[in-house]
């Protein structure tokens, strides 16, 4: 099973982003470009076109680009409510960042207190109850400690008695309070886990669903590595944000308030004022410093996305890397991105050291002053030693949540940044939408397709189709031919509503496709692309993808109809054979026959074949075309023959079409049957003769080579 060969890294990356139809026009083995047929075709010219010209890539702006030159993206930027690039690192002012943070927290509060979900609300309330109970028990611990110290401040040799009699009850109370606080904390975590995980699932699912619903232009302009990395970090941030909101920020504020109240009541306002001042200073320093550090983390995230994207692209395009000996180049690209990540991560680490040092200085200074005040009270007889211990324990007990709050705030900022990217993805506008009153597509005429005065360009200022009008009769086999960039594959994208035309309309049986539901429209169209997108799963799964409810018997019948069954059962694992990433473990011809099997299983009334036999040898191509023609003659659910469109450069594969439409410069140059077009002696006739001449010469060259090889063997 030879792997299919990809001609460039751009080919595979564009295919991966596209996922539905091939974006590239492979160099034809013997079919010359229609764009070159204006001159009288000669054998010398035809040979030169294949031996000296670079492969040409299909350009969305309607032109053909030389692959030897650096490719420039022609995909329009995503427009809508979200940013043009939701993955980009955008520096914001402090006010803008706070506004964005509050918007995210407001959004997440919906998941914290979900409407209609009384079970989740009960869990949140129970978690809060356990939280308050745990904090109350935690604050009781220093009081037990004070009583133990004061009760033991006696001369046991004089008074007699034992530790159990003097402080036993308080020691048990001390232990019970600590155990109760810990148990409450763990129960709280267990109760709230369900709420957090449900939120993660909902956000991740909504984001994934939104990505699948986004326009083709978005996926052409984004790289999978960066998207998956952003989703991964964002979903992890959700759990931390919800947990920190409920279990860290609110509890710490509650504990600080309780400690300040206790200090004021027992020892005077001075202790409470010093504690409050310390907390305010600590919090302000943490917030300001973390806000300053945010830009370093954002830059590190951008570098991380870049490195992940490069790694994924290089591994997916493994064969292309090997074909051109570019391992060192790819490693260099990856290392360059890692170097940028290293640079920004060092800034993150050094600024973190500054933050930690400042926090410890503030807290330690305040604790030192408070201990001096307590020691002075003991010396003057106003306080007992137990009171000094109580003050120390109460304030020092705040160090744990405060230190944790510092790290929580840092991680909270990180989570908010990650979630900002995630929610920005959800804000990217979907431009291809159903009308509110959209109805299912109904084929009342058998599937007649009409393009009426259609003008479209990926860039509006550079239209590919210009006032294009054509009709594809219902139940007929129609071929679309023309030079690369004339809009052949664009017809499918418009028909499938990946894009809407800037002008004009497209009708199926008289129904404007913009007025029907997307689900019914796309279910009615079956596609066999030039480069078949396959999942890294079994052969059976990839065929069944055309109809997920199909039985194993139906899968086998579809494979037989596509002339791939015998090949599949010859493999060791048969239909359970894994095809590899994008089907790289099987040949291009096998991939295309799997695509035909998938189409047969879907059984749609409208069929689109985009160079569907380009990777097949002549014998297999002929057999498969005969089988496809037999399928086309099959009747649909209502008795109509299937309407089929073939995009082709090999004219021998479509000469028997009921109608052949030749596109040129975004318009219909001519149309008719093969006989009519040959009699007209126009563009189509020139191309046909050019291909026939080339095939004749190639046959002569092949025979000459065989004779020379036989002669050499005889001489030997």
From Swiss-Prot:
GO biological process per UniProt: intracellular iron ion homeostasis; transmembrane transport
Enzyme class: translocase
Residue spans crossing the bilayer: 124-145, 169-192, 242-265, 267-287, 354-372, 388-409
InterPro entries noted in UniProt: AAA+_ATPase (IPR003593), ABC1_TM_dom (IPR011527), ABC1_TM_sf (IPR036640), ABC_transporter-like_ATP-bd (IPR003439), ABC_transporter-like_CS (IPR017871), P-loop_NTPase (IPR027417), Type_1_exporter (IPR039421)
Binding, ATP: 458, 482-493
Region (Disordered): 57-87, 697-716
EC number annotated for this UniProt entry: 7.-.-.-
Domain named ABC transporter: residues: 449-690
Residues of the transit peptide: 1-18
Sorted UniProt keywords: ATP-binding, Membrane, Mitochondrion, Mitochondrion inner membrane, Nucleotide-binding, Transit peptide, Translocase, Transmembrane, Transmembrane helix, Transport
Annotated positions binding glutathione: 293-297, 356-359, 406
Membrane topology, Mitochondrial intermembrane segments: 146-168, 266, 373-387
Topology term for the membrane: Multi-pass membrane protein
SMART domains: AAA
Similarity section: Belongs to the ABC transporter superfamily. ABCB family. Heavy Metal importer (TC 3.A.1.210) subfamily.
Chain's role: Performs an essential function in the generation of cytoplasmic iron-sulfur proteins by mediating the ATP-dependent export of Fe/S cluster precursors synthesized by egt-3 and other mitochondrial proteins. Hydrolyzes ATP. Binds glutathione and may function by transporting a glutathione-conjugated iron-sulfur compound.
Name of the protein in question: Iron-sulfur clusters transporter atm1, mitochondrial
């Amino acid at each position: 099973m030879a792997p299919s060969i990809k001609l460039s890294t751009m080919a595979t990356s564009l295919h991966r982003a596209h996922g539905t139809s091939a974006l590239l026009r492979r160099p034809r083995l013997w079919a010359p470009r229609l764009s070159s047929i204006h001159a009288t075709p000669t054998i010398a010219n035809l040979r030169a076109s294949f031996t000296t010209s670079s492969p040409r890539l299909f350009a969305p702006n309607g032109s053909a680009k030389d692959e030897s030159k650096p490719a420039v993206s022609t995909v329009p930027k995503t427009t809508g409510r979200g940013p043009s690039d939701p993955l980009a690192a955008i520096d914001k002012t402090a006010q803008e960042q706070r506004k964005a943070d509050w918007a995210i927290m407001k959004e997440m509060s919906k998941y914290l207190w979900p409407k209609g979900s009384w079970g989740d609300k009960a869990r949140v309330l129970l978690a809060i109850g356990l939280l308050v109970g745990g904090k109350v028990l935690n604050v009781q611990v220093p009081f037990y400690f004070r009583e133990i110290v004061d009760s033991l401040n006696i001369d046991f040799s004089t008074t007699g008695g034992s530790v159990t009699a003097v402080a036993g009850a308080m020691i048990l109370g001390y232990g019970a309070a600590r155990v109760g606080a810990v148990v409450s904390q763990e129960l709280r975590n267990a109760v709230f886990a369900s709420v957090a995980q449900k939120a993660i699932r909902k956000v991740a699912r909504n984001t994934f669903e939104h990505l699948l619903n986004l326009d083709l232009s978005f996926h052409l302009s984004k790289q999978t590595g960066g998207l998956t990395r952003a989703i991964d970090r964002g979903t992890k941030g959700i759990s931390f944000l919800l947990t920190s909101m409920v279990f860290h920020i609110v509890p710490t504020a509650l504990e600080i308030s309780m400690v300040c109240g206790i200090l004021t009541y027992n020892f005077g306002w001075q202790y409470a004022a010093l504690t409050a001042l310390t907390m305010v200073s600590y919090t302000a320093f943490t917030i300001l410093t973390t806000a300053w550090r945010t830009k370093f983390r954002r830059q590190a995230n951008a570098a991380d996305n870049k490195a992940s994207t490069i790694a994924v692209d290089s591994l997916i395009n493994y064969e292309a890397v090997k074909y051109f000996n570019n391992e060192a180049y790819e490693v260099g690209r990856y290392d360059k991105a890692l170097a940028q990540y290293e640079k920004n991560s060092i800034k993150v680490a050094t600024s973190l050291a500054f933050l930690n040092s400042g926090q410890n200085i503030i807290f330690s200074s305040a604790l030192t002053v408070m201990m001096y005040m307590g020691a002075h009270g003991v010396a003057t007889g106003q306080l007992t030693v137990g009171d000094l211990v109580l003050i120390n324990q109460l304030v020092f007990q705040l160090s744990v949540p405060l230190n944790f709050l510092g790290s929580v705030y840092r991680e909270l900022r990180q989570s908010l940044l990650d979630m900002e990217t995630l929610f920005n993805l959800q804000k990217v506008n979907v431009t291809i939408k159903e009308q509110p009153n959209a109805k299912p597509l109904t084929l009342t005429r058998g599937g007649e397709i009409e393009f009426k005065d259609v003008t479209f360009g990926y860039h509006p200022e550079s239209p590919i189709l210009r006032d294009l009008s054509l009709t594809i009769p219902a139940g007929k086999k129609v071929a679309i031919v023309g030079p690369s960039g004339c809009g052949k594959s664009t017809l499918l994208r418009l028909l499938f509503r990946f894009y809407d035309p800037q002008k004009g309309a497209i009708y199926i049986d008289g129904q404007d496709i913009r007025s029907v539901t997307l689900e019914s429209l796309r279910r009615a169209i079956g596609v066999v692309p030039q480069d078949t997108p396959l999942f890294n799963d079994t052969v059976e799964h990839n065929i069944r993808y055309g109809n997920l409810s199909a039985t194993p018997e139906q899968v086998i019948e579809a494979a037989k109809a596509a002339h791939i069954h015998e090949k599949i059962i010859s493999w060791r694992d048969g239909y359970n054979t894994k095809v590899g990433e994008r089907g790289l473990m099987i040949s291009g011809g096998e991939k295309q026959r799997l695509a035909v099997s998938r189409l047969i299983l879907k059984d749609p009334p409208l069929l689109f074949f985009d160079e569907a036999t380009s990777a097949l040898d002549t014998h297999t191509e002929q057999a498969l075309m005969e089988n496809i023609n037999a399928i086309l003659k099959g009747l649909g659910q209502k008795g109509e023959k299937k309407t089929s469109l073939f995009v082709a450069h090999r004219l021998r594969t479509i000469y028997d079409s009921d109608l052949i439409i030749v596109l040129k410069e975004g318009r219909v140059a001519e149309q008719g049957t093969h006989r009519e077009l040959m009699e007209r002696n126009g563009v189509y006739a020139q191309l046909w003769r050019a291909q026939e001449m080339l095939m004749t010469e190639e046959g002569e060259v092949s025979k000459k080579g065989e004779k020379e090889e036989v002669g050499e063997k005889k001489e030997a």
